[in-house]
């Protein structure tokens, strides 16, 4: 949660980021491990979102919980298939679900979650270079 305190001074954003941070990866132990993935309803983010629905009513927070890995998946598609638009289609789907009003919240969470010291920061750099209408944040 240190990154949440560093990335913004906005109290509402901090509260939302803390909720997502605490819940988003708690159900990895239930996730289907077969690859390629056979059933996306058994993704840890779906389990986390369903759990969060019991306590959180704000759809934008639930969407960020459920979709928290989408930017990483889009980056991975871009790396694997750079000659196609697959990554951009995935990002467009993400932003259709989130809505423009919550793109910044998603980005801030993605950056907080990635900059924990044990993950490659390249997906966030790609996101920052690719996505328009976000205010870049520094950690």
Stretches found by the model and what they are:
Residues 2:
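Active-site glycine- and acidic-residue-rich loops that bind
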Residues 5-116:
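Divalent metal-dependent catalytic cores for phosphoryl transfer on phosphate-bearing substrates
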Residues 100, 104-139:
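Charged substrate- and nucleic-acid-binding regions of tRNA-handling and nucleotidyl-transfer enzymes
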């Amino acid at each position: 949660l240190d990154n949440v305190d560093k990335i913004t001074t906005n109290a509402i954003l901090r509260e939302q980021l803390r909720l997502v941070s605490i819940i988003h990866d708690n159900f990895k132990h239930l996730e289907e491990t077969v690859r390629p993935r056979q059933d996306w309803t058994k993704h840890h983010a779906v389990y986390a979102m369903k759990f969060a629905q019991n306590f959180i009513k704000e759809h934008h927070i639930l969407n960020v919980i459920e979709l928290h890995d989408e930017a990483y998946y889009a980056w991975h598609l871009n790396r694997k298939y750079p000659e196609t638009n697959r990554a951009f289609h995935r990002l467009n789907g993400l932003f259709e679900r989130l809505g423009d009003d919550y793109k910044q919240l998603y980005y801030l969470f993605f950056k907080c979650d990635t900059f924990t010291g044990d993950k490659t920061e390249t997906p966030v750099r790609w996101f920052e270079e690719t996505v328009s209408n976000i205010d870049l944040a520094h950690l």
